């Protein structure tokens, strides 16, 4: 049976399916490692939902109760609109568009939702202690239906308080100026540290009784329930790690999740970026800061991967010549590295995606993000081959190229070289783009 790449389609979204090429060739031990790491990836989902908006989890769970209730008619226009809205929430990890960050509102009415909520089993709804269904509706409906309330997840408009006008859930009752001053003081106190910490990366900044403090995301702190589940599966993964170096960095990641200590996170990043022998690798943690208007807080994400051996040969050819590209880069010499350190590049197959990486995932990744670690220890670049393959295969037959390509000769060139050129472009971007260059002294 021919593999079908296209799946469900709704709103402005087309879901794709992807293959796990080469999975059967992995050893049983490697497959177990992928399974355990995949379980650790799945348990981070609700962290991302909460980070993307204070009300996301309750809205999702409320609508899931309605969606699963067999007593409510499923063949009405309103129910179909509710289904599409819920699918969009699942896709975007909340009520904000996954790319534009603007809030999308339901195409069903408040009256309809109020009516069906009165018919479901109230014990299944995400009610707070002592809260009635009516009180829940009064709190959540304005967030869902009023376009003027919390309209954007990440706001970067000039002249606005970016923290107060962004719906992302990294700050509580805190202004932009207060947050910037809080972390500026931390960085100033740590100015002489040759291994600086990524202050604010793994915490929610709150103000209580006029005092600012961090609620750290760790096993006995905020998001503790999900993190403890992640730790459990990481501990299982320890027993089937591919080598001692991998076992060591998994142990450090567990220690980081248990303590919330950013110094441990630095040590984990250094060991992770230095391990190159395993076929199976993963990302699990609070990584990218694009979801925070101040660029400090890490959104949770997970990725489990294994090497695409054939395609990796081409990326390693690029990475082995990283110094040549650095030397010949058309930029000011002040921004060039004299010696390029540890640029590694692999083409991988994604076995499991989670959090910010799911379901709208990157096609290439370069980590770690800390500039000082990259400068001293290098970085890992990956191109995700089975995701790019799904994009390419799903796009065929749409008629787009036939309509807009200028002539038949050009069309034939695109058909022959288009996919591989796209892959080379991603390789160059991740490996040489993110892996090259240096900052001026004193610039963060």
Show which residues each predicted segment covers.
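N-terminal-proximal low-complexity accessory segments that begin disordered
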Residues: 2-68
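Active-site-adjacent bridging/hinge elements
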Residues: 10, 34, 395-408, 434-444
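Compositionally biased, low-complexity linear motifs
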Residues: 38-51, 252-267, 443
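Surface-exposed patches in mature extracellular/periplasmic domains of secreted proteins
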Residues: 46-49, 74, 245-249
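Contiguous, non-catalytic segments that form substrate-binding/exosite surfaces or channel walls
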Residues: 84-414, 418, 422
